[in-house]
């Protein structure tokens, strides 16, 4: 199991809070020879000039944003000047091939450009320009084509080199650049705490630790890269609050109940492995029956409280908003993220992550078999995947919002599963208002009191 740390003191701008690092990045970023080798060895049916596509996009963006060194502009002015007249018509691929010997490297850029290159193109970290290119290829071609034998893991070489490609990537690069300039970290969290270390050991899979930061761009880019890789690699990525003692207690209580929750975060790995095996080998409960029982409980509670189910609980489908961002990892006290772990849980199906993260079974929070049953149903119905959690919060990510005609039924299920989303919400919260959120949202948020 590998553990990586997103903050690496030698990495450009990791700890310098958006200012330029002392050391200038002069290293190699990319070499067309690597991509040409793929084309030749795999016999890919593409023109060899395509090996330079993504490099030309990066170079053009940096020229447009005045990130090139004075030496570069002087030395190559004759060749670059015609491009400067109309960059939208510029094809820098031949220039990179013939003048730069097919390479991009830090010395081509001015101080700011080199520092940004070190951050975004120097190391296979997050965010990382080549990974953003791969993500765009997935978005452009769709899953089936992207993972097809035709592309042989090299879909990026097949993207048509046109203005649409450039503009799509320019938008991504602008976001990365703005994040890099404004980013700051809580220095006290740069190294994982003892609890975070224990949590990663408990998860026993590839984990990346993220310190507390003001902009979640590195976190979300890493999550999105992992999501793309997960299809081939066979894991499910989950973002987990790292310094959550109650979450730790819940995990141990469920998977290693004989442990008295030692102060040094000790646990019995054999017992934990046994628990996981047991949960994964048991047949998943009848999802519909589990949800119907939960909804039945809510109806009984409404009756006990003399509340009219249709009028007061369901209400009208109105007053919603769109929710497309995770909120469970934000600390509202300082507007920074909590320290987080991105875990690549080694399971085949999204609902099976709860065998590794059995955080429920207290108050109204469902137990592990119930979590698995409901998550399986929602994945099959809506493509919903559990994506982020703390001890009392759980967020699902969906490929698209629930269609309006199905939103009310889905909202009733969500209320059955987690009554606090409405009962602990604003006074006028209803299932209908929740349905109005669902029809606009790709993130479902749950919170148990």
Map each language-model feature to its residues.
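Alpha-helical transmembrane anchor segments and their immediate juxtamembrane flanks
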Residues: 1-9
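Short, extreme N-terminal segment that most often corresponds to the first beta-strand
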Residues: 17-68, 442-449
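Polar/charged low-complexity regulatory segments
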Residues: 28-29, 34-37, 43-44, 155-177
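Amphipathic protein-protein interaction modules
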Residues: 89-165, 297, 301, 386-421
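Extended, low-hydrophobicity segments enriched in charged/polar residues
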Residues: 185-350
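Well-ordered, non-membrane alpha-helical segments in soluble/globular domains
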Residues: 218-222, 365-376, 407-412
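Surface-exposed, low-hydrophobicity interaction/linker segments
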Residues: 329-377
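C-terminal structured domains
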Residues: 404-449
């Amino acid at each position: 199991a590998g553990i990586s740390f997103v903050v690496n003191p030698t990495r450009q701008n990791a700890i310098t809070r958006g200012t330029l690092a002392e050391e200038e990045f002069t290293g190699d970023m990319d070499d067309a020879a690597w991509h040409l080798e793929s084309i030749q060895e795999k016999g890919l049916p593409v023109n060899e000039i395509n090996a330079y596509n993504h490099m030309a996009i990066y170079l053009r963006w940096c020229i447009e944003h005045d990130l090139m060194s004075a030496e570069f502009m002087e030395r190559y002015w004759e060749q670059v000047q015609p491009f400067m007249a109309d960059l939208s018509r510029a094809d820098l691929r031949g220039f990179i091939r013939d003048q730069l010997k097919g390479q991009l490297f830090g010395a081509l850029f001015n101080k700011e450009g080199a520092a940004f290159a070190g951050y975004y193109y120097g190391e296979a970290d997050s965010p990382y320009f080549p990974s953003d290119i791969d993500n765009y290829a997935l978005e452009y071609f769709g899953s089936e084509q992207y993972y097809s034998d035709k592309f042989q893991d090299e879909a990026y070489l097949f993207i048509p080199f046109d203005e649409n490609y450039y503009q799509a990537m320019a938008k991504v690069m602008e976001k990365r650049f703005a994040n890099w300039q404004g980013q700051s970290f809580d220095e006290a969290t740069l190294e994982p705490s003892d609890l975070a270390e224990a949590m990663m050991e408990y998860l026993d899979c590839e984990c990346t630790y993220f310190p507390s930061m003001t902009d979640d761009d590195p976190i979300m880019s890493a999550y999105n890269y992992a999501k793309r890789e997960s299809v081939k690699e066979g894991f499910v990525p989950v973002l987990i609050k790292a310094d959550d003692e109650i979450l730790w207690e819940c995990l141990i209580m469920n998977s290693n109940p004989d442990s008295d929750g030692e102060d040094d975060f000790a646990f019995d790995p054999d017992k934990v492995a046994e628990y996981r095996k047991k949960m994964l080998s048991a047949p998943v409960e009848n999802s519909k029956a589990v949800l119907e029982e939960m909804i039945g409980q809510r109806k009984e509670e409404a009756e006990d409280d003399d509340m009219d189910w249709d009028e007061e609980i369901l209400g009208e489908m109105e007053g919603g908003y769109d929710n497309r961002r995770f909120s469970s990892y934000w600390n509202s006290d300082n507007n920074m993220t909590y320290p987080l772990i991105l875990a690549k849980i080694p399971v085949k199906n999204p609902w099976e992550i709860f065998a590794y993260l059995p955080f429920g079974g207290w108050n109204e929070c469902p137990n592990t078999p119930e979590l698995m049953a409901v998550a399986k149903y929602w994945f099959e119905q809506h493509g919903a995947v559990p994506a982020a959690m703390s001890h009392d919060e759980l967020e699902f990510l969906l490929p698209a919002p629930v269609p309006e005609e199905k939103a009310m039924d889905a909202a009733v299920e969500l209320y059955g599963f987690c009554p606090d989303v409405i009962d602990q919400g604003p006074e006028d919260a209803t299932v209908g208002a929740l349905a109005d959120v669902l029809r606009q949202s790709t993130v479902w948020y749950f919170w148990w009191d």
